[in-house]
UniProtKB/Swiss-Prot annotation:
Domain of life: Bacteria
Keyword Transmembrane attributed: yes
InterPro entries: Lgt
Binding of a 1,2-diacyl-sn-glycero-3-phospho-(1'-sn-glycerol), residues: 169
Protein name as it appears in the record: Phosphatidylglycerol--prolipoprotein diacylglyceryl transferase
Organism in which the protein naturally occurs: Mycoplasma pneumoniae (strain ATCC 29342 / M129 / Subtype 1) (Mycoplasmoides pneumoniae)
Function per UniProt: Catalyzes the transfer of the diacylglyceryl group from phosphatidylglycerol to the sulfhydryl group of the N-terminal cysteine of a prolipoprotein, the first step in the formation of mature lipoproteins.
Length: 389
């Protein structure tokens, strides 16, 4: 959120570009959060996923635009639904506010469309240091062209949003917003109650301690709590989950929705009434549902449905669909049922959608002709990934 100009504290302004044109700390910190999220995205793109393609950098501009516009549109939507319309102009970002839920929603939709269309139009160069065995033994770095699943892109992008949210929440502090109810002690004393629970802020973060005394009462610093837990979840999802054995593509991305949904659902219910929106509470619950369903799907069903063309899957007939699902949970799946054969025959390799292939870059690459980065065409009988020298 972002309060109106008149309700901001005097220390919310960083500097002035001219008479009547203040630059707020809120905007600066949100920009820093976006920049840091982009940095984490680029670092993982280059050093972990080893992608060499400018098309992925183009999406950064799309993501920033959709994040801001989606957050702004969602703010206007929840204000209208909850009957609190401020009447401010949509493009006057210094008045009114932003709601991150809308930014996440619109950017996710933009990513699905962009990467799904992009991945079906072309293959992408990925860097592989490999042992090339075609009557020779040698180690060489090659750039292999292959299709990349949009679920892998979700794993790459979603965790970076968390650290952006964690940093951006400090902008809410400078705007004196995203706080909880007033703390009141047994003797109607807010100071004693604040010292009991949040006294450590007086030493560690004195500015935060002073800033949480709003309208004569100490308020729970929800922005600080959300920033802390977003950082913890970011570290786990971004740095740890990629190295957990058995984690399938898509699970990391949906873990973001689960994590941010849990944090926001708990904190949204604790907000001060002036900043509490029922729409945000419902949306946070939906994020949790999306995260749980997505993780279950990626860890269980997705691997069994890999390589099937879903258009034929849904249109082939309800009885064939039922027959197909019965085979998914049979212990012996060495022989597919007739409906499964039918789906495979309809799914010509050139028509299979990368969206549902769910492949990581460390998958075993099948024997085929690989187009190298220097446009040299070679046939490899076997391509085995080995650690880089």
């Amino acid at each position: 959120m972002n309060p109106s100009v008149s309700s901001r504290p005097p220390w919310s302004t960083a500097f002035y570009l001219g008479p009547g044109f203040p630059i707020q700390w809120y905007g600066i910190i949100v920009a820093i959060g976006i920049a840091f999220g982009i940095l984490m995205f680029v670092l993982k793109l280059i050093y972990f996923y080893k992608i060499q393609d400018n098309s992925f950098y183009f999406f950064i501009f799309i993501a920033v635009l959709t994040m801001v516009l989606g957050a702004r549109a969602w703010y206007f939507l929840i204000e209208a639904v909850d009957g609190r319309s401020s009447g401010s102009n949509f493009f006057d970002f210094r008045n009114g506010g932003l709601a991150i839920q809308g930014g996440v929603l619109l950017t996710t939709l933009a990513g699905i469309i962009y990467f799904n269309v992009f991945l079906n139009m072309k293959t992408t160069k990925t860097k592989t240091t490999a042992k090339l065995l075609n009557n020779k033994n040698q180690i060489k770095t090659v750039y292999v062209e292959r299709n990349i699943s949009v679920f892998v892109m979700l794993d790459l992008i979603a965790p970076c949003v968390l650290i952006g949210q964690a940093i951006g929440r400090w902008g809410n502090f400078f705007n004196a917003e995203v706080y909880g109810a007033a703390l009141v002690g047994s003797k109607n004393d807010t100071l004693s109650a604040a010292n009991t629970t949040w006294g450590f802020l007086r030493i560690l973060m004195p500015k935060v301690w002073d800033g949480m005394f709003i309208n004569g009462s100490f308020r729970i610093p929800l922005f600080l709590i959300e920033s802390f837990f977003n950082t913890i979840f970011f570290v786990f999802i971004y740095f740890v989950m990629d190295h957990i054995k058995g984690i399938r593509s898509g699970t990391i991305g949906f873990s973001y929705f689960l994590a941010t949904g849990i944090v926001r659902l708990i904190l949204e219910t604790q907000r001060d009434e002036a900043f509490k929106y029922n729409t945000s509470i419902v949306f946070s619950a939906l994020l949790i549902l999306v995260g749980i369903v997505g993780i279950i799907y990626c860890q269980t069903l997705a691997i069994k449905l890999r390589g099937y063309f879903w258009t034929y899957f849904f249109l082939y007939g309800w009885y064939k669909v039922a027959a197909f699902f019965t085979t998914l949970f049979m212990k012996d799946r060495t022989q597919a049922c007739s409906s499964k054969f039918a789906f495979y025959e309809k799914s010509l390799p050139e028509k299979e959608r990368s969206f549902f292939q769910l492949k990581y870059y460390n998958d075993v690459l099948p024997p085929k002709i690989y187009r190298l980065y220097d446009h040299e065409m070679l046939m490899f009988d076997k391509l085995e990934a080995v650690p880089e020298a």
